[in-house]
């Protein structure tokens, strides 16, 4: 979008996905969630984090993993995508650079042996966990049981959309639910954080002066309900329209409806 870059004096297009971790805007929610995840790592077996699409789960995970002490923890990232119980064991071993046997009994035995002997605590992050099969979700309760030692040997971070919380509310997930002492639900940004996020995004794209007026930022918050992905879409479209129409300052009347 060279026209936009040239018109507004930007070095790159803001409101995209290619932001580096150090440039991520630290909202109150991100700071609080990151602190909770960090504190939960030492003692918790299972952590639950949910939020609607575009609420910042991926950014939170990136920040969380980026700040992990790799001398103490081994992060493993998996996606739920219809993952079955055998695949869950297999994928964890593979990500830990261990060849997984085909037999479910053998793969379970090797999993427990590997975790017991690990010098660094594995942190298993399962994104889109709402898409896992029931048998895989149910298996997690057994996968954190190490009767020989009361210490937490492994930590599962289950990340998903709000339906994940609904799924584990069913009675057959009660034993799993009881093991989850730390759970976080993400929502939209506040008005203050939405305005700060917009200004920050413009600044890291190379421009010191503001592009969006206060009324525009307020209207963007109202339309997006503070959901980051929606904020990005509205702002991106407004920048394109603003450059085409030569609007030095984007006002609320310049905002384009975005589905």
Task: Tell where the protein language model's regions lie, with residue ranges.
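A short, basic N-terminal segment
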Residues: 1-43, 256
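C-terminal alpha-helical "lid" subdomain
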Residues: 2-4, 35, 62, 175, ...
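Mid-core helix/loop region of P-loop NTP-binding domains shared across ATPases and GTPases
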Residues: 5, 84-91, 99-139, 147-154, ...
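Conserved NTP-binding/hydrolysis module of P-loop NTPases
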Residues: 10-17, 73-75, 83-102
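Walker A/P-loop nucleotide-binding motif
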Residues: 42-63
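Conserved catalytic segments around the Walker B and adjacent sensor/switch elements
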Residues: 47, 70-80
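Short regulatory helix/loop adjacent to the ATP-binding pocket of P-loop NTPases
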Residues: 65-67, 164-179
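Conserved AAA+ ATPase "SRH/arginine-finger" region at the nucleotide-binding site
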Residues: 78-81, 168, 181-194
């Amino acid at each position: 979008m060279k026209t936009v870059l040239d018109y507004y004096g930007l070095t790159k297009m803001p409101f995209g996905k290619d932001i580096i971790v150090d440039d991520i805007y630290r909202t109150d929610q991100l700071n609080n969630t990151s602190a909770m995840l960090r504190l939960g790592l030492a003692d918790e077996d299972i952590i639950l984090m949910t939020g609607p699409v575009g609420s910042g789960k991926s950014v939170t995970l990136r920040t969380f993993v980026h700040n992990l002490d790799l001398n103490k923890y081994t992060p493993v990232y998996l996606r739920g995508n219809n993952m079955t119980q055998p695949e869950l064991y297999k994928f964890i071993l593979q990500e830990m650079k261990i060849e997984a046997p085909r037999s479910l009994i053998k793969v379970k035995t090797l999993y427990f042996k590997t975790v017991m002997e690990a010098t660094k605590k594995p942190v298993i992050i399962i994104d889109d966990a709402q898409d896992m099969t029931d048998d895989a979700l149910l298996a997690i309760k057994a996968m954190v049981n190490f009767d020989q030692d009361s210490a937490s040997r492994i930590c599962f971070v289950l990340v998903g959309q709000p339906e994940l919380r609904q799924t584990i509310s069913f009675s057959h997930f009660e034993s799993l639910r009881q093991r989850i002492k730390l759970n976080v639900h993400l929502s939209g940004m506040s008005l203050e954080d939405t305005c700060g996020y917009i200004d920050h995004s413009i600044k890291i794209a190379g421009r010191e002066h503001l592009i969006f007026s206060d009324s525009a930022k307020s209207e963007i918050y109202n339309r997006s309900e503070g959901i980051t992905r929606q904020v990005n879409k509205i702002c991106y479209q407004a920048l394109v329209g603003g450059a085409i129409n030569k609007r030095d300052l984007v006002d609320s009347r310049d905002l384009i409806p975005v589905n």
